[in-house]
């Protein structure tokens, strides 16, 4: 009898061990994250954090994707095709038009990462030469669209006498349109301009930073449903992002190695982007009041909105500062 009891206990122990061996560790939280575009160097911390296991360390399994501009990304948020969107500060205007999401943290300040570019053989040499030109942008209401309208506003150019922004999406259609003279230039990622300068295809006329002193270039958008039901996942993502920024600051060579492959640019261009852009990433996601004021006023001044929107329509501060 005692021997039978011992056998039973032994079998029970084996069963418990089997359960422990087979049972998975606490499953990582899946999070769908969409970049507004695939080719911007400033969005590559997502890839760095994924490749270095930083988001995984925070209990996240990132499902990454990219859209063809801010408006397309906002459509993905509306359609519940993504949980998080990495997009533009001007994109916060979409929140007033029914997109069921809010900005939860600032990602990037003044637009040191953006530029106005023209075809390599264009007669345009200075900002003043942009008057009357057609410049491609990603989508209506995007950061790139905002920059074109901002230059018009500061220069006092109106209507067709100034810059005409043409929504065209990403780099491939823009390059084709400039080659066939359908467009004079493009407003986009500075490093893309540098890369195409090396190929003697485009020239950078100006960066975007001179046209604004205080600004919110990029933010993180999160669906309101995700904010309400999975706030800890949002916090984990933001912590993972900020840890990734710290890693990038401390590891230039590895960052250049990863990011040059992600956005398909030479390492020399990625290194230049690193040197010029790395310092402008937010370290805690806080919304700067001066930058918000400039952004909100511009929505009205440029005809994007009729009235200055309330803060709580566009963003929430419950996740910042990120700690």
Q: Model-predicted segments: where are they?
A:
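Conserved C-terminal helix/tail region of periplasmic/extracytoplasmic solute-binding proteins
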Residues: 299-323
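Pocket-lining segment of extracytoplasmic ligand-binding domains
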Residues: 89-92, 172-261
């Amino acid at each position: 009898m005692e021997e039978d009891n011992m056998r039973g206990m032994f079998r029970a122990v084996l069963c418990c061990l089997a359960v422990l061996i087979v049972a998975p560790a606490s499953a990582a939280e899946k999070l769908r994250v969409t970049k507004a575009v695939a080719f911007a160097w400033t969005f590559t911390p997502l890839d760095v954090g994924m490749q270095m296991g930083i988001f995984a360390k925070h209990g996240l399994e990132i499902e990454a994707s990219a859209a063809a501009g801010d408006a397309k990304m906002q459509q993905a948020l509306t359609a519940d095709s993504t949980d998080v969107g990495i997009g533009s500060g001007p994109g916060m205007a979409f929140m007033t038009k029914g997109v069921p999401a809010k900005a939860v943290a600032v990602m990037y300040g003044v637009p040191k990462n953006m530029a106005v570019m023209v075809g390599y053989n264009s007669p345009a040499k200075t900002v003043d030469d942009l008057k009357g030109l057609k410049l491609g942008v990603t989508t209506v209401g995007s950061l790139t669209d905002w920059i074109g309208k901002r230059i018009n506003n500061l220069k006092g150019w109106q209507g067709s006498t100034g810059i005409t922004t043409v929504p065209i999406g990403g780099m491939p259609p823009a390059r084709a349109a400039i080659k066939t003279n359908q467009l004079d230039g493009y407003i986009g990622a500075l490093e893309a301009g540098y890369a195409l300068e090396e190929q003697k295809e485009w020239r950078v006329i100006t960066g975007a930073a001179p046209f604004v002193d205080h600004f919110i270039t990029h933010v993180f958008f999160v669906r309101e449903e995700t904010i309400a039901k999975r706030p800890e996942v949002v916090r984990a993502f933001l912590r993972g992002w900020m840890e990734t920024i710290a890693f990038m600051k401390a590891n230039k060579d590895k960052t250049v190695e990863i990011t040059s492959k992600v956005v398909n640019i030479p390492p020399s261009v990625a290194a230049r982007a690193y040197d010029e852009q790395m310092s402008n990433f937010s370290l805690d996601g806080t919304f700067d009041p001066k930058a918000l004021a400039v952004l909100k006023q511009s929505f009205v001044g440029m005809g994007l909105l009729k009235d200055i929107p309330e803060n709580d329509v566009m963003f929430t501060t419950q996740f910042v500062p990120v700690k």
